[in-house]
Amino acid sequence: MPRCPSPSHAIIDLSAIAANLAVVRKRAGDRKVLFAVKADAYGHGAVEVSRYVEKHRYADWLAVATVAEGQELVEAGITLPILKLSPADPWDMDAAITSGIRLTVVDFDTLEAVSKAAVRLGITAKIHIAVDSGMGRIGLRPECLAELTAAADRAKGVEVEGVFTHLPISDVPEGAEFTRREIDTFMTAVSLIETHRGPFPLVHLANSGAILGHDLGKTSMVRAGIVGYGYDPNPHADRADLHPALSWISHVTFVKTVSVGDTIGYGRTWTASETTKIATVPVGYADGLSRGLSNKGHVLIRGSVHPIVGRICMDQFMVDLGPDSNVTVGDEVVLIGTQEDETLTADDMAELLGTISYEITCAISKRVDRYWVGQ
């Protein structure tokens, strides 16, 4: 039996991703480009995006957060090297090593566990050592890097392929001085080791914010995340050279007229102040539309911006069309994207919710069909 399409769908413009990664390539110079495709490529579809990026050589590496994410890519035939950015876990270490996924080593215990697993499997595990230069999340401090690197060089079954850190405030102007000091501290630690050890094959620290706004120094790879999907990590930056790749589209399923005093939705949180028309749209928080946008968010219908009214339900929400609307059942509804001369972005949603564009696109659920264009 043919599968019915979902009530809403996301359209991913792969040519936009290509254009965004061209911006990254230009900033990276001769450095390698790692493209983060974790969280299903930030909601854009990891397998399809990775295939496209590999086919056209828009990136040299891919990054994931879990071994399962990496395995999905390997099983789909992706051959680009894949780095698991989060710490190597004992329970999926064997699967990672067998699949050729590069592992992140954060301390001596992790190193020992990777070494034992690699020796037992008879496979060399390639690792990247994480340094905590200010993020406070994973890795040892820069002053411990030399000792951990020496231990890794001695460990059986392990090949040190890279060393990296992560910059927590590279995306805003007020973080420039801290980021500069952080980069200097990390690179000094790396340089001291390389003077007697020899160079690390890969040294990387630049996330999207650093790629767009900082000196990349003597690094050999950059890590593009949200920038590849068309958003600056600083939502207040004016980046005309970035193109959001994802649009989210639905349609009107019902239109009715309400009178003054009529209420809409659970909790009766919205009351009509005039006779107006209300449209129902078959998208809800189960699809990834945050309930926090109730009585806050907006959509595009027939080229005009209309407010979401009442509480967003699990599977539906309502829109105030105004008293003179000629919107009908079946009309296109744009949640993210462009319609005629109007555009709504993930940044617009994020600002209303006090969050970031990353969370908006990652939250769009599997219930929403994806379609890829621009190949």
Swiss-Prot record:
PROSITE patterns hit by this protein: ALANINE_RACEMASE
Pfam families on file: Ala_racemase_C (PF00842), Ala_racemase_N (PF01168)
Principal EC category: isomerase
GO biological process, one term: D-alanine biosynthetic process
Keywords, comma-separated and alphabetical: Isomerase, Pyridoxal phosphate
EC number per UniProt: 5.1.1.1
Coiled-coil portions: none
UniProt-listed CDD domains: PLPDE_III_AR
Record GO cellular component, one term: cytosol
Keyword Metal-binding attributed: no
Pathway: Amino-acid biosynthesis; D-alanine biosynthesis; D-alanine from L-alanine: step 1/1
Keyword Isomerase: yes
GO molecular function ontology, one term from the record: alanine racemase activity
Residues recorded as bearing N6-(pyridoxal phosphate)lysine in the entry: 38
Residues the record lists as binding substrate: 137, 314
Known role: Catalyzes the interconversion of L-alanine and D-alanine. May also act on other amino acids.
Family: Belongs to the alanine racemase family.
NCBIfam families found in the cross-reference section: alr
Name used for this protein in its record: Alanine racemase
Native source species: Cutibacterium acnes (strain DSM 16379 / KPA171202)
